């Protein structure tokens, strides 16, 4: 799964298959390095603007579950690749639960 660059309006939803749970639903953009930490010196020094803006389109339930489990700094340091997000056991359990849910 290749990280994407946001298009003109990253907050706009688009439909497709969520890479985390596999459901066909409206998708939202998740920054792999959360925007809240973009101004911190460590991240400005080690990452260029293009890398800071990479992310994944995923469903709202998966996206919310990620942010409920981990704070922005942890996400930026430890979960800044799609592979790291999908390999985490706690997130895997959440994604499996979301996959069993019906879309309202």
Predicted regions and their residues:
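Short C-terminal domain-edge/linker segments immediately following a structured domain
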Residues: 50-51, 58-61, 87-93
């Amino acid at each position: 799964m290749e990280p994407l660059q946001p298009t003109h309006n990253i907050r706009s939803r688009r439909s497709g298959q969520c890479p985390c749970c596999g459901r066909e639903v409206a998708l939202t953009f998740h920054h792999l390095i959360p925007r809240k930490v973009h101004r911190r010196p460590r991240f400005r020094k080690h990452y260029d603007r293009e890398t800071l803006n990479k992310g994944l389109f995923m469903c709202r339930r998966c996206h919310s579950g990620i942010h409920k489990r981990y704070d922005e700094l942890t996400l930026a340091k430890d979960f800044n690749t799609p592979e790291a997000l999908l390999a985490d056991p706690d997130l895997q359990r959440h994604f499996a639960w979301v996959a069993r849910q019906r879309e309202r």
